[in-house]
Amino acid sequence: MSKILILANNSSGLYIFRNELVLRLLQDGHEVLVSIPDTEHAEELKKEGCKIIHTEMDRRGTNAAHDIKLYKFYRRLLREEQPDIVLTYTIKPNVYGGYACRKEKVPYISTVTGLGSSFEWTGLKKKMIVTMYKFGLKGCKCVFFQNAENKRLFEELHIKGKDSKLVNGSGVNLEKHRFEEYPGHKDDITRFLYIGRIMHEKGIDEYLYAAKKLREKYGDKVSVSVIGYSDEDYEDKLNQAQKEKYLKVIPFQKDVHPYIREADAIVLPSYHEGMSNVLMEAAATGRPVLASNVSGCKETVDDGESGLLFEAKNKEALYDTMSFFVETSIDMRRAMGRNGRAKMEKDFDRKKIVEAYIEKIIE
């Protein structure tokens, strides 16, 4: 059996969205090593049988000295552990881990989980990011993409490995995110819920605008909530929104399923995604999703059938969509939820994603 090294920028993404792959590798008899900078889910991964390697990493920083240090660490780690194959996730492991693998002649498979805001830059910054990705992925055995737009962009920019494969994100665990019958609240209140980082690029400004306008139109017949970590820039805005009673703020939750179950619709006005896990989980649970018509969101929705799409960065479009949903019948909402579950079962089952990775690992 093989020794497999996983390079990731945090334990949460690995444990919450990719643990089924980790468990499959362990069950198949492989030795699995995990390089992560945090300890949040390190103990769980260790108990499953992984060897944890603490790795210093400034996930979002642009300090060149820190990044060079990370690259050197990866090269040293590869020499010491001599893995048979390496799996890398997110930009820094993809770039610096990938380049280290190429220099050490170790086969590696990279996953582009999304492009974030870096590819919206222009000029020298954009050129630098593209060059870094070219260095990181040049020798890659296979590059996995989570949406077609990311794959197309990389092809246009001539960023490529030896092979590539398109998958539907990390997929969704259909057993964990089980189908729940539509709530049909007797109080006739329509409950909207946003789950995710409370930050500008997730469309939180548009969401706050729509929430306030919905309150003005419908009063107590609409409830708008958020769950997630807040960037410091939004603390005052959230406090004011709560004070004016047009938003409910729920602290970060490890298990969001109970909240999805009680929601009438999940809303994600994001500017860009790799493939939204929140939308997949909501659809799997049988809840309509209202999402930006952007890559990483639109793939999870059949517009008008399992949810509604709207123009990103357009606060009026978001408000109009949420307002339209308030006016829909319970039967229409229930049908949307069932259609969403069927879509997840057909195209987004995480078991299928795991098989796609296993196929490339043993190839």
Where are these regions (language model features)?
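Donor nucleotide-sugar binding/catalytic pocket of nucleotide-sugar-dependent glycosyltransferases
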Residues: 53, 134, 138-179
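Acidic anion/phosphate-binding donor-loop and adjacent secondary structure
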Residues: 62-66, 155-156, 170-189, 258
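Short hydrophobic beta-strand element within catalytic cores of glycosyltransferases
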Residues: 288-291, 301
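A short, well-ordered alpha-helix in the C-terminal region of glycosyltransferases
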Residues: 317, 324, 331-347, 356-359
